[in-house]
Amino acid sequence: MVCAMQEVAAVQHQQQQQQLQLPQQQQQQQQTTQQQHATTIVLLTGNGGGNLHIVATPQQHQPMHQLHHQHQHQHQHQQQAKSQQLKQQHSALVKLLESAPIKQQQQTPKQIVYLQQQQQQPQRKRLKNEAAIVQQQQQTPATLVKTTTTSNSNSNNTQTTNSISQQQQQHQIVLQHQQPAAAATPKPCADLSAKNDSESGIDEDSPNSDEDCPNANPAGTSLEDSSYEQYQCPWKKIRYARELKQRELEQQQTTGGSNAQQQVEAKPAAIPTSNIKQLHCDSPFSAQTHKEIANLLRQQSQQQQVVATQQQQQQQQQHQHQQQRRDSSDSNCSLMSNSSNSSAGNCCTCNAGDDQQLEEMDEAHDSGCDDELCEQHHQRLDSSQLNYLCQKFDEKLDTALSNSSANTGRNTPAVTANEDADGFFRRSIQQKIQYRPCTKNQQCSILRINRNRCQYCRLKKCIAVGMSRDAVRFGRVPKREKARILAAMQQSTQNRGQQRALATELDDQPRLLAAVLRAHLETCEFTKEKVSAMRQRARDCPSYSMPTLLACPLNPAPELQSEQEFSQRFAHVIRGVIDFAGMIPGFQLLTQDDKFTLLKAGLFDALFVRLICMFDSSINSIICLNGQVMRRDAIQNGANARFLVDSTFNFAERMNSMNLTDAEIGLFCAIVLITPDRPGLRNLELIEKMYSRLKGCLQYIVAQNRPDQPEFLAKLLETMPDLRTLSTLHTEKLVVFRTEHKELLRQQMWSMEDGNNSDGQQNKSPSGSWADAMDVEAAKSPLGSVSSTESADLDYGSPSSSQPQGVSLPSPPQQQPSALASSAPLLAATLSGGCPLRNRANSGSSGDSGAAEMDIVGSHAHLTQNGLTITPIVRHQQQQQQQQQIGILNNAHSRNLNGGHAMCQQQQQHPQLHHHLTAGAARYRKLDSPTDSGIESGNEKNECKAVSSGGSSSCSSPRSSVDDALDCSDAAANHNQVVQHPQLSVVSVSPVRSPQPSTSSHLKRQIVEDMPVLKRVLQAPPLYDTNSLMDEAYKPHKKFRALRHREFETAEADASSSTSGSNSLSAGSPRQSPVPNSVATPPPSAASAAAGNPAQSQLHMHLTRSSPKASMASSHSVLAKSLMAEPRMTPEQMKRSDIIQNYLKRENSTAASSTTNGVGNRSPSSSSTPPPSAVQNQQRWGSSSVITTTCQQRQQSVSPHSNGSSSSSSSSSSSSSSSSSTSSNCSSSSASSCQYFQSPHSTSNGTSAPASSSSGSNSATPLLELQVDIADSAQPLNLSKKSPTPPPSKLHALVAAANAVQRYPTLSADVTVTASNGGPPSAAASPAPSSSPPASVGSPNPGLSAAVHKVMLEA
């Protein structure tokens, strides 16, 4: 439009200049030409220019020969030019018809227009007349000039031709001879024809003419308005057929009457001056004067004013109509119908002139082109679409603004462009305004211009477009809260953008692959190229690490220094793994918790995968980060974790055999790090997506590198579980390593100070304490198996406390407990549970002072299952000899544990026996089996290893030559003990690794004396123990405090019982003096009834557990022991047990007094040894009772003298409340003839002393007998919760239920209850079943007045 208006203005300026030149041209034409009357038809090619072809037709009163003479020379001169122009015209038309249609966008404003004045019938006739005249004169007539058409309607063409013909009929324009003006116009004509061959026109020598009062178009028509409708579609090839049709329509228009002519006269000003600038005629009219020309100009100006007023009225009507259409409810429908019916646009950029022009275009087009692809059809379609879009924009403006505010979630003026819409909704919600219901069925069209007409529908539309009631704030928002809300919204927006970007990046596999590979190469220093050079250099000239450690393995200072350097070197590598994880796409979007969880769980895995190429299986070594080589044997000797090292090397060899590339290693590291199955992750969805994409990238790389190995990816992923297992083992090892070495320097300084004090004080220094006074129980203190709560009850008394109290033995001078605690406070605190230090590994006891009196039994003994060790065992030879001469049965569980337990421990030294490794002659190594996680006790790295370990098994760690010598010497010493004391029946089993058959004890002392550093190491205090820490954690709990209280009571009760048994045994008859062989070598479970004082009973009970294959893992903590214990008693059973104990305690004194009456009065069968079957039954059913009593072999005959019920007292936690009526001399022996049964509520075993079951005999049916003396018969007892309490007259005693011990499924046991009314102690004889009558029946007391009630119980 702008270009069109500029062109129109330029044309108007040219026309004004031509109007000024018009009077001068007219005067020249009047002077130089004769007055001749002729009609001139002008064929004008107009682009504001001047290609004119004038054909003159003489009038009837003028002779033909004059005109012929005048123009003869002219036509002859023009004949050649015309022929050439016709040829050019013909060629241009052919090219134009054959060319493609010209698009609207390619048309320029300056286009040449064909003007043909044959639309009116008179003009057609004149053209035919001229053609006939030219044929007579052998001249070719002027034909149509070819141009391209413009884009507007052809109504202006009709106006132009009509105006021309009207002016010629009235003879208003006088044109005379053409020669004077010919000089002014030929150059533009030549230039114009030269620019384009298709724009050629017929030039004339004298195109002089007068201008037909051209004026600017007041209607504002565009430049593209054409003047001939026939050529609006130049790309159609049916041009001549359409031309004939147009002629017929024009004939109908001429015969329409004078109305059509008046309309044509009323529109002379509508001539598009941009296309036609001048109209030329060559025949002057003498009748026309300047006055007539002035009148013509006056008429044209009046007509222009009339047209302008009409256009203004139409514009006003259209605007009103547009306003009405917008206000209507169905505006869209009206817009569509209006656009289709009328082309008068409702566009914001259109004016009234354009609207009128569009109407005229439609009127002219209806009579013209019938093609759908015509220019006019395009214009009408475009205008209708433009109007529709304009209306849609106005209608949807508020909706778009509302949607934009709804997307941000806040209704603020900063978000929306219109503050009123926001304020209306906010006021409506805050003030709770109730608007009047809509009267138009609630279907009002809410637009920007009419939104205030119906507030009800306006509020309804606000809610419909997404405005939220919750987003409206009632009151002022604080600045802090507002800033927080804005920050949260901004963060949410950024997160959404990052997530979209991440999704795009993850979906783009090449991009993800490139990012991961770039991250791996930038953060990993150990690529295949670099590592290959390092491995080659290590093979050619290796530089081994840790030479100082190998030279002096007991000196920890160089190792600590190297470890610090090692940690510093690894810090950079670990940092590289962290940076690599951060560069993985999507990792930065995770929360801090998820990042920490993934890195903590997968850091070692990824690091190990990166460094897997540093393992060289060809030289059986590993290349350190500094380029040095560390041999596999050195790692084993230093860390003493062979299983972990072997597993690591095997896994490395397995991974290196796959020959992974750098790309595969990088992607595999990413998969190891980004694993969705880590516990504690929150954003699982994102992590799973990342994992799947990374796995797809790895699959793509593997398929590309190894097309012939389709199962390679599955094989690679199968290594992840093994990798995690190694990571777990390594982490456990690091935890222990970190815990130990925090106190390493302080502990060594402490040991050095104690070692200096040990030179002058042999019996008072810490070394003297470890060498002399530290017996098995005190020094050994297996913290891994004995909890700190039990250690609190230990007593640092002399070893004589473990001896029988009835025998006085000369003992060497011992240190007092107070002196021990004062000289070794750390050890005392350790044993009492106050300081959770762990015992050092391989730290045996050495004694340079008093070496002749000491015997080093073993340097250390391992507790197999949990990786803990026992500290050195130092034992006095005199004490050992005294105990062996006396033949005490419980010497295996006293403080000198190593002396009498040689056979059992040597059997346990065998690899197939994994039991308590506490032997006097053998030292047991730790099992390096898959159960070993690689966690050692703490100082395994300082062990002096053997140079050649050819005789070691593949499942054990290599030991030093010192250990081998000690093992062999211990075996030899044990063999000597067996020879000297054959009654112990010690079965000697040679160690597994014994290069020498026997070694003297002097060699052991010499080895220790020659190695003072080893002596100090072995005398060093224990290190921290994680098991003790766990025990300390459980200690404050009230549940375990209660258990400790019960255990203490149980220990006291059992100790008193075992003490009385020892006294009676020592003062027994000569029959009992020889020790039976069947009791001399009991298994550890059967020999667990040794007597002890109350102070040591708890530790004693724990070390002598009844289970034959008790795993030390079960004694890892109090909780583990409680879980491994036997079933607990129900509250009802506990109540019954308490009642029984109360009644038993009442008769303890009377039972003790009654035992002194029958000394030596025993039946012959009572002193016999029970048969092996009975012993087997005893061992079989020893721990099967779960109620209140343990099984015992019932005596087949009871003498009348054995009526006293001297039962061994037991606490509520002890289930061994069995009290058989025995003789005075063997009451305790018969009572303890069965195994001790552990309480469900205690973590230690009882201490019933195993004695000779001489009171038992061959009994076909073992019965369970319980005798209870009730002092007061007026107190009834209710033993069952379900059964009612029997009346006191019928029930005067307690009936206790027990599990029968017999092989048969059912057993009837006789329980004899005797009630006593304060008289002498009553005795009840329990008869055997009817099938087996007793051999001798004891006669009851004649003074017995209570009835005997027998209760048969089905088991």
From Swiss-Prot:
Q: Bias category Low complexity: which stretches?
A: 77-91, 143-179, 308-321, 330-344, 797-809, 948-960, 987-1001, 1053-1098, 1106-1117, 1197-1233, 1242-1260, 1315-1343
Regions of biased composition (Polar residues) lie at 218-228, 254-264, 1149-1162, 1174-1196
For this UniProt entry, the molecular function terms from Gene Ontology, in alphabetical order, are:
DNA binding; heme binding; nuclear receptor activity; RNA polymerase II cis-regulatory region sequence-specific DNA binding; zinc ion binding
Reported induction: The expression of this protein is developmentally regulated and is correlated with the 20-OH-ecdysone induced activity of puff 75B.
Entries under Pfam families matching the protein? Hormone_recep, zf-C4
Q: Which GO terms describe its cellular component?
A: nucleus
Annotated family: Belongs to the nuclear hormone receptor family. NR1 subfamily.
Give the main localization category: nucleus
Q: Which UniProt keywords apply?
A: Developmental protein, DNA-binding, Metal-binding, Nucleus, Receptor, Transcription, Transcription regulation, Zinc, Zinc-finger
Name the PANTHER family for this protein.
ECDYSONE-INDUCED PROTEIN 75B, ISOFORM B, NUCLEAR HORMONE RECEPTOR
Specify where the region named Disordered lies, as residue ranges: 60-91, 126-228, 248-268, 308-344, 780-821, 927-964, 987-1007, 1051-1117, 1147-1260, 1312-1344
Physiological role: Implicated in the regulation of ecdysone-triggered gene hierarchies. Probably plays a key role in mediating the regulation of the larval molt by 20-OH-ecdysone.
Zinc finger (NR C4-type) in chain:
387-421, 438-457
- Reply yes or no: does the keyword Nucleus apply: yes
Protein name per the record: Ecdysone-induced protein 75B, isoform A
Where can this protein be found? Nucleus
Composition bias type Acidic residues, residue spans: 200-213
Q: Kindly state a single biological-process term from the GO annotations of this entry.
A: negative regulation of transcription by RNA polymerase II
Give me the stretches of Basic residues compositional bias. 66-76
Binding region for DNA: 384-474
List each copy of the NR LBD domain by range: 508-756
Q: Which cysteine pairs are covalently linked by disulfides here?
A: none
Species the sequence originates in: Drosophila melanogaster
> Gene for this protein?
Eip75B
Q: Does the keyword Zinc-finger apply?
A: yes
